[in-house]
Amino acid sequence: MPDSRATTPPVVTPATVDDSLPVGAPEGPAAEHAVRGNGLDPTLPAVLTVTAGSKRRSRGRGVVFWLALVWLAVVVLVALTASWLPLSDPDKQDLVNRLAPPLSDGHVLGTDGLGRDILARLAFGARVSLIISVSAVSIGMLVGGTIGLAVGFFRGWFESVTMWALNVVLAFPGLVLLLGLVAFVGQSLTAITLVVGFLSVPVYARVARATTLAAAQRDYVLAARALGASNRRIMFGEILPNVALPVAAFGLVALGVVIVLEGSLAFLGLSVKAPDPTWGSMIAEGRQHLSTTTHLAFIPALVMFLTVLAVNFVGDVLRSRFDVRESRL
């Protein structure tokens, strides 16, 4: 009498897969027959191959992420401790040693057209760039995020009026409006920070509004409304935690944009006034000697490029990590 008990499917182990599909095994029907002979799904090797490739890409992305994070940590540390590091005075002129090449005696990265040490000016220029960019991004996130949260939550006429005003600001060419405001309020560190922060408010408000609209339709928010929770409790207890992370991740990406923006202002001579060094002003000064000493413009441009690249990569990884829509892809 035949056995009516159901057969137990074989357990799939790495050894089973390796034995069924050895390296160099034939593809096509022969390979499929070998796999079916062991009771395995013929699509399993392809799935395992895709998974292995994804793991390799993820591992490589993780290495680049940590390299970018280390570079940013070094830049921030140098900017914060520039006054205590064994560096030359960034404003001290030595006309005898002007335009010295890199690795010169006492000047690791050489000197500029006035004999000032490039390494010292890079370190102190990093401080100016980071102060302006971090402060401006913080202002934009705080003010714009609050506006976007309120607009997305209350809706109605308040949303219409507020978004109309923000769209009017966004309609102006950003660089032209920035140049006009800087020329009007002055070129102090505080003035430039406030102007750049003000111009970034509409962008953060739109991001916060879109995230708030999506979070307001979640089941836990609807449940809180049904239980009689106040608007304040729902806004700050339920919606704000879900809005803060995407806005902060977007702010990290925008940090690179602000660094380039400040560098552009300095290149045009509209950032902080001399003799305070900035990366953009160093590039502008090196432009005059491109035919003879290219390192004057190349070194600060390279430092700015690597910093912005690291900020963009870290911000993109964090944004995809905390963005619910992308984390499911």
Which positions does each model-derived feature cover?
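Transmembrane alpha-helical segments of polytopic membrane transport and secretion proteins
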Residues: 1-73, 313-329
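Hydrophobic alpha-helical transmembrane segments of membrane transport/permease proteins
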Residues: 66, 74, 78-113, 268-276
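Membrane-water interface segments at the C-terminal ends of transmembrane alpha-helices
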Residues: 72-89, 125, 164-188, 256
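Generic hydrophobic transmembrane alpha-helix motif, especially the helices
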Residues: 108, 112, 118, 142-144, ...
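Transmembrane alpha-helix signature in integral membrane proteins
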Residues: 118-153
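Short hydrophobic alpha-helical segments within the ABC transporter permease transmembrane module
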Residues: 118-125, 165, 208, 216, ...
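Glycine-rich helix-loop "coupling/hinge" segments at transmembrane-helix boundaries
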Residues: 170, 181-185, 196, 210-212, ...
